[in-house]
């Protein structure tokens, strides 16, 4: 029978190969910056690339009621899976999508959009995206959304 370990010890060489399975170290929650978010929003990184050929980043993002992102886009698109509360996602055409726990919304590469918690409940989603060819261009941040854009009455 194999022994179950919470975190396997490093090999005698002191280094692990990329193929070694490991428990990821827990990272502290980060409050997102006001230049990119309005209201209180926290991010917990779930997974990030280990090697140069990996692109996927996964994070749990928690929004206080009414909190929202600024307009932004992603070089390779983004998947967002709502896990708690009611989310509002909007695009430049004025479309507002209300997304509930268990639903996933996809934003194609380059589409300018925002995500937000509805005005009266906390919202949490899992964000999944791949880095752009130049990681600095993975997300392009733009101006803050207006209340009219948030409400879909622009």
What is the meaning of each model-derived region?
Residues 2-55, 138-154:
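A short, N-terminal "cap"/entry segment at the start of jelly-roll beta-barrel domains
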Residues 42-45, 57-74:
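Conserved short histidine dyad/triad with adjacent acidic residue
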Residues 43-44, 89, 125:
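Short hydrophobic/aromatic-rich beta-strand segments that constitute the beta-sheet cores
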Residues 69-71, 89-90, 107, 112-119:
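Short beta-strand His + acidic residue motifs that chelate non-heme Fe in jelly-roll/DSBH
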Residues 76-88, 92-93:
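Glycine- and acidic-residue-biased ligand/ion/polar-headgroup-sensing regions
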Residues 79, 106, 120-140:
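A short hydrophobic beta-strand segment most commonly corresponding to one strand
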Residues 93-109:
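Short acidic-glycine-tyrosine-enriched beta hairpin
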